[in-house]
Amino acid sequence: MKQNFDDRKIVKQYREIARQIVKKEGLYKNMDQDELREQTNYWREKFKTKEMSERDKINIFALAREAASRIIGLDAVVVQLIGALVLGDGKVAEMKTGEGKTLMSLFVMFIEVMRGNRVHLVTANEYLARRDREEIGQVLEYLGISVALNESDLDKDQKKAIYTADVIYGTASEFGFDYLRDNMVRQKEDKVQSGLDFVLIDEADSILIDEARTPLLISDRKEEDLSLYQTANKLVKTMLKDEYEIEEHKRFVWLNDAGIEKAQKFWGVESLYSAEGQAELRITMLLMRAHFLMHKDKDYVVLDDEVLIIDPHTGRALPGRRFNDGLHQAIEAKEEVEVKEESRTLATITIQNYFRMYKKISGMTGTAKTEEEEFRQIYNMDVVVIPTNLRINREDVPDDIFYTKKEKGRAIVYEVSWRYEKGQPTLIGTSSIKSNEWISGLLDAAGIPHQVLNAKNHAQEAEIIAKAGKRGMVTLATNMAGRGTDIKLDPDVHKLGGLAVIGTERHESRRIDLQLMGRSGRRGDPGFSKFMISLEDDLLEQFESKSWEKLSVKLKRKAPRDGKPVNSSKIHAVVVNAQKRLEGANYDIRKDLLSYDEVIDLQRKMVYKERDLLLERNKLGVSSEKILREVAEYAFIHPVDIEQEKLEKYYARQKELLGGTKFPVSFDEVSLMEPAEVVEKIVTWHKKERDKFPIETITAIEKEVYLNLMDQMWVMHLDAMVQLREGIHLRAYGQQDPLVMYQKEGAQLFEKFQADYHFYFAHALLELDPDGLVQG
């Protein structure tokens, strides 16, 4: 891939600095460990009061380079140092697989610690976090830097201990969940995460882009009539194609007029779009999504009567993860397995909004340039392509395009068989378990031994990948094929052409295609890559158009029956265009998710800030008297000439809502007093009751009650926002923008949430009892 002018300029600038670092290798050669640690302490102290110069940076890099050479026997080369300098600028460094990103990370982490920042190193999974912590962590520890591993099974005290380290390794979800859990604690001392200074993200495209479609959620069980899912399943199984509309690439399906009429008759409601029919509409739409948009062995897999999500970008099953907002239950009903309770959201944040809270963020990956616009727009990060240390020696040939999947399958078997006969290892990449198993059947029929890797046997991943570079080995894998791990070639494989990679479908992102190709030709090894695709592949079917249908029919009519690939510039253009459109659609989904989450994000920050102040001060930020006065003023504003009968009902309602059994104002008093006098009497009575408590006791009670009510109301508010989000598109008519409607109604719901917990707090204040603390 060509680098743009800015890339070349940056790389040229940093190449000179990197060469100066290498020239400094004699500077620390004769120092023992204690002397090197003294250097570490010197730099740490210096930058507490002074800015870091370029000369300082060169010396610090040289110090880390010497330590790596001693401890793990690796001397960082110029391109790795260039990459580290790019990371230090808060950019994404695209470095080809096998070029040494792990060693590159050492330098930016070390220099950020010298600047006084606590560093979080984020990896794609716990295995990689543990591996990299062991390898690079020992170098940092040799220099006196504390290093820890953030794992999911740690208790609160262990978490607090690891967050005191200078460098902490872990997964994106674990850091994110720690943040959410910290904002659910009842005491300040129970928080574990201590500041978000600098984060370095490995496999940045996977974490910041691919995982961005799934928000982080902490939830519990939500009571619901689960039988509705089975009932709706009966309806949707009878749906005909002329009863609904579908845009699969946008992941959207809806009922047309015929479908609405059928559903209303089935449910026995006059209108699905009335308040009466909202529950039935929601459950019907969920089952339609499950049947028409979610595909078994592609989006999910059923193992031991359990529905498991398949990560679309890694091909891995995700045990413990569930589709939210009822979709998982809908799929369970579709597959006729046990429908489990839907979860209720207690706390949530998107990957985008979590990482944007860090003061500084950098990323490294083998494939990022194709997503540069998204990195720049969402994260304000440029992508810089780092040159390889050795020339890439892989042969990448144009796609072979076949008319049918059947012809493609025969051609793949032929391609694999002759490479197998000569002993060349071959990696066959598929986009789903379904196609993975189809190709496996073809290879079995041809008598070609092979190993299979997909979400159903992911536990053997390391073992399978370890064998993939052996002479004569054929490996069939979904796109989970070992990100973060090398396929090492047997010595005699080089002369056979290295590892051959055969892609059986173009993926929904060019980036994933490049990742598959990047399995071969690492560190100057020879290699080969080719995609063998057909006009019947899912990518093209998702973007059917009248013009494409006409072209497809015309091409198939003229197709030679010899099974050879067609070399048509028109077809190549259609494939490229379909992939770009799908990339654009997925980007729109992620932008859409972020736009909607930004509404909640603003609200979340306000609530979490108020919680933090409450925990910090250990008392209310405003007096309970002020809150009670505001609520009482709101409750007792009524017309002076109100009719007697209405006043009695009004009084009874307000008494029950505001004060319950201990309401301090009688009906007779209310009927004779001005609203302001009623309010004053309520506040005065509360003050007298409050003064009966020791100050420490009443302060603690008020804080606990307020916090408890705020948390309860926040959970209810999140649920209300989910319901609003689910239904907003169904209610968006004419020129009304669903996002604008969501922002407006979301703001109204937030105002109601704030009013509600203040109202219930005022109620609790009037129920205070010096003997029983808070009644009820």
Swiss-Prot record:
It is an enzyme of class 7 (translocase). Its main location: membrane. Its EC number is 7.4.2.8. It is found in: Cell membrane; Cytoplasm. One of its GO terms (biological process) is protein transport by the Sec complex. It is a peripheral membrane protein. GO terms for molecular function: ATP binding; protein-exporting ATPase activity. Transmembrane segments: none annotated. One of its GO terms (cellular component) is cytosol. InterPro entries: Helicase_ATP-bd, Helicase_C-like, P-loop_NTPase, SecA, SecA_DEAD, SecA_motor_DEAD, SecA_preprotein_X-link_dom, SecA_SF2_C. It catalyses: ATP + H2O + cellular proteinSide 1 = ADP + phosphate + cellular proteinSide 2. Part of the Sec protein translocase complex. Interacts with the SecYEG preprotein conducting channel. Has a central role in coupling the hydrolysis of ATP to the transfer of proteins into and across the cell membrane, serving as an ATP-driven molecular motor driving the stepwise translocation of polypeptide chains across the membrane. HAMAP family: SecA (MF_01382). This is Protein translocase subunit SecA 2. It comes from Listeria welshimeri serovar 6b (strain ATCC 35897 / DSM 20650 / CCUG 15529 / CIP 8149 / NCTC 11857 / SLCC 5334 / V8). The lineage of its organism: Bacteria, Bacillati, Bacillota, Bacilli, Bacillales. The gene is secA2.
